[in-house]
C-alpha cells in the first residue's frame, strides 16, 4: 500500500507552489483562496482540506481518525473532459446521485455535495495519487485566477 500524505505536507506544497493565496482555518477546514494583493474581501475559492464531517456533509466519513478530504474546483470544460456531465444538485443533507463510496481513501472522485459545481476530491491521497491530483490543483488555480480577474474588473 502506498504512503498516505499528511495535511501538513499538502499545505506546504500548496503554499510553495501557488502564489497570491489567502489561508483560512475554521472548524477543522483549511481553505485557500486566490486573492492577489488582497483586493477582494475574501478572494476566490481555490482548494480546501477538510478534517471533519459537517451537518450536511457526512458522506466522506471524515470523523475517522486521521482522515481528511482534499477538494478543488474545475472549470466546466475541464470537468466535462475529465468526468463527463455534472450531476444534479443534491437536496439539503443528501449527496449527489452517483455510484460512489465517498468514504473511500486515496481515490480521485467527484465531491459528494458540490460535484454539481465542478468540485472534485480525494480522501487521504497517497504520494502517487497526489501527483495526479496536482494537475487538478493547477486547473483549479487557473480557474481561480480567471474568476478573480473578472471580479476585479467589475469593481
What are these regions (language model features)?
Residues 1-155:
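Charge-dense, helix-prone N-terminal extensions
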